[in-house]
Amino acid sequence: MSADAGAGAPLPRLCCLEKGPNGYGFHLHGEKGKVGQYIRLVEPGSPAEKSGLLAGDRLVEVNGENVEKETHQQVVNRIRAALNSVRLLVVDPETDERLQKLGVQVREEMLRAQEGPGQAEPPAAAAEERGAGGENEPPAAAPEPREAEQSPQERRELRPRLCAMKKGPNGYGFNLHSDKSKPGQFIRAVDPDSPAEASGLRAQDRIVEVNGVCVEGKPHGEVVSAIKAGGDEAKLLVVDRETDEFFKKCKVIPSQEHLQGPLPEPITNGEIEKENSPEALAETASESPMPPLARTASSDTSEELNSQDSPKKQDSTAPSSTSSSSSDPVLDFSISLAVAKERAHQKRVSKRAPQMDWSKKNELFSNL
């Protein structure tokens, strides 16, 4: 049997993963009617993708221990017990089927018999084709400086992607789902060798347009109906996680116009804070006259804000606002409503004519 395996028979793959800040980056699940645990989803840019792990792979061994007959929870516990690194022996569906027909039991020794050091290269080569970077440690560090630099060249890469596909015998080959924690419709998994994978569609992509129609904010059912309405062809405009965050910072919805040409500029927090700063709002209030209703509301608000101030504090601030309060006490926002009313009353009293002495009144009327 080992001779058959050595004579051009398909081989399993050994994927060595180093845990990242978000874990290994793959989802494990069991399939109905099948024995064993399968890789359901591999997150882009994760240690799992860089190791060559693919969605649809069947897990055979964990750190050299066969797990084909173990339950889902047993396999999960075994992977967790490995701490910061794990070694997974997997087979893709085609290899699995051919090895079962040959009656070959999948084991890690098969790779050692086939020039162990050299046999670890094919998974890395497959990872390079998928844009994951090299073999283990050195290639994994390559993308990180690019993310830290954030040069204009990198910004040009933050574009939406137009994935055009034709339906195959098993459909398009991707699963759509919605996430409760964030709006939008996302690609949950892409089947290997499917029209979706050939079009460049990737797991975790968010759908923006379906056949040229924007589906932002539409529910899951409407997006599915829009895809089905395309018949045997579909054109999906999608964004990956990083591109999605970039366009959200720019306050712009991605479109096919962004496939080429200039990209929008992100709106910085500094500009927003400057526009909403108290100084800017004060300048705007002083330059533009306020309607009567707004004046009343402002005076009520100032009363509420200064209700905790002591009388001494109000007296100390009064001289600085005498010029504005003498012309119109209602416009003085630094005093309370009660003080403003009192000043208005004093102003009306001060405008009255002085009272005349009774003797002068009698003398005036007697002359008449």
Curated annotation (Swiss-Prot):
The segment(s) forming the PDZ domain are 14-94, 162-242
One Pfam family per UniProt: EBP50_C
Q: Where in the cell is it found?
A: Cytoplasm; Apical cell membrane; Endomembrane system; Cell projection, Filopodium
The annotated regions of Polar residues compositional bias extend over 296-309
Q: Name one GO cellular component term.
A: extracellular region
Q: Would the keyword Transport be found if you checked this record's keyword annotation? A: no
Modification sites for Phosphoserine: S2, S46, S277, S288, S298, S299, S302, S307, S310
What this protein is reported to do is described as: Scaffold protein that connects plasma membrane proteins with members of the ezrin/moesin/radixin family and thereby helps to link them to the actin cytoskeleton and to regulate their surface expression. Necessary for recycling of internalized ADRB2. Was first known to play a role in the regulation of the activity and subcellular location of SLC9A3. Necessary for cAMP-mediated phosphorylation and inhibition of SLC9A3. Involved in sperm capacitation. May participate in the regulation of the chloride and bicarbonate homeostasis in spermatozoa. May enhance Wnt signaling.
Q: What is this protein called?
A: Na(+)/H(+) exchange regulatory cofactor NHE-RF1
